[in-house]
Amino acid sequence: MGNSLPVESKFTFEEENDRIKYVVSSMQGWGEKMEDAHAAILNLDDATSTSFFGVYDGHGGAEVALYCAKQFHIELCNHEDYHNDLINALDNVFLSMDENLQQSDAWRELVIPHDNGCMYFLKAGVCAKPFPQATYTGPAYEGSTACVVVIRGNQMIVGHVGDSRCVLSRQGGLAIDLSFDHKPCTRTESERERVQNAGGRSLGLRCEQVMGNYVVKEQWVLGDFGGGVTISRSIGDFAFKKNKDLDREKQMLVCDPDILADDITDDMEFLVIASQGLWSCVDSADVVSYIHDRLSVEGAELRVICEEVVEFGLASGENTTVILVQFKPGAFQYQLVDPAGFGTAVSNIASTSAAPAGASDTSDEGVMADSCATADTSGSARAESGELVPTPSANNTVTDEVDPTGTVAADDKVDPNSSANADADDGAPKPSLGAVIESDEVALDATATGHQVAVRQQEEFDPKKCWICGKGYKKILLEPSSARARNPLLAHAKTCESEDKKAKKKITKYMMKANVTNQYH
């Protein structure tokens, strides 16, 4: 939150080939500056039928996210296993990107804005170089998430670190999460233990008052420093990766990605790849349902739908970037003899239909390493993979990369001298719709044993609509006065208060029930 009014202008680009059509749209919103970055390329190279899509949510600055968007896909294409074992290549690229940032500051040359070079060097302290310089250690409190999708032939790989997310829609609008937020409060117990054993401590529940309600966050901090992060895996953030007594994979923050790979079948409709700015406001099932319903309308344009989804992130107070990838009907019915160089690609994307909340299901498509699949209470199936592989970014000219109005050429081929288009974001995690964080010491339920935050569904008040007039949250976002508020739902309710004498009592009761939580911040 750094602006008196949100920056609602959007960067939007679309492209298609005979198999897929995609639209990418990004918006700064209430963020003080743009820290999201993205990369989208329909044809990554001439030799293989490979497409690449990546969203990078920066924090502590935009530089790391921009670097990922410019360089990730190039590192991938240059890897020796790119053609024969794409899974292994992706895994190594995640780690090599982290190493590149830590070895020297040469990477910053790719992300220096050409029209603001003097200010950058002043900020970096170049003018003070007569004094001996300390050994370079990498960006201490600058980092980025990464959520990427690589499509080759009739197969796809999803790899990620952090809390940017990829969601698949199967026929009928069934939402399936293909990535899982890397946060100590929502991942496995081992994730939290790793952070604690490396010297991290939890601030517990940090509250920020917003219009009479409260936002509750959990943040990890170093035991001896004031800096903190809200994710447990990232690229960069080397202040959290410098414990000399621990191996790389045991540091407080790591860069080991989770990977999921599977065949693309004809019942798959589209993918949504987005930064935390979107998922802070709406859950996976709501996003997929909205897009599915809009696509069913005759004459609906994918570009317009993507921009509408980006606007949902306005209430988060963060930057929002969304890549919407639509599979064309019948385009993925063929089967390759060789799995297109995916190597030991392993996966299992859950296939559920009308399954009861909390039930688990698995499909017979593919095989997945150390994975499990469950359906969450919001109705979206989740498939959780073990730790395997990484990913890249898109290409374009350096000028286009640092210019928010630049264009990503979807059919650009990878050139070692080229780079990708980008924008930038601060991914602070927040609860999803319908959830309230009560304490960081209470278990969620049977499926979340070991989590030290409790999430419960509000029983009386539906968090997706106004508790006074009953208007839905999506319609409230269309009201200019409400959409510009930090909390659109509460702002709308305050308007209703002037029209309903009983509203004040209802708001008071709601506040008491929600206690110290407002998931719409």
Swiss-Prot record:
Cofactor requirement: Mg(2+); Mn(2+)
GO molecular function: metal ion binding; protein serine/threonine phosphatase activity
Leading EC class: hydrolase
SMART domains reported in the protein's UniProt record: PP2Cc
Chain residues that bind Mn(2+) 1: D57, G58
GO biological process: signal transduction
InterPro entries from the UniProt entry: PP2C, PP2C_BS, PPM-type-like_dom_sf, PPM-type_phosphatase-like_dom
Cofactor note text: Binds 2 magnesium or manganese ions per subunit.
Keywords, comma-separated and alphabetical: Hydrolase, Magnesium, Manganese, Metal-binding, Protein phosphatase
Residue ranges constituting the PPM-type phosphatase domain according to the UniProt record: 21-327
Pfam short name (any one): PP2C
Catalytic activity: O-phospho-L-seryl-[protein] + H2O = L-seryl-[protein] + phosphate; O-phospho-L-threonyl-[protein] + H2O = L-threonyl-[protein] + phosphate
Residues where Mn(2+) 2 binds: D57, Q276, E318
Region (Disordered): 354-431
Cross-referenced PROSITE patterns: PPM_1, PPM_2
Enzyme Commission (EC) number: 3.1.3.16
Family designation: Belongs to the PP2C family.
Protein known as: Probable protein phosphatase 2C 16
Organism listed in the record: Oryza sativa subsp. japonica (Rice)
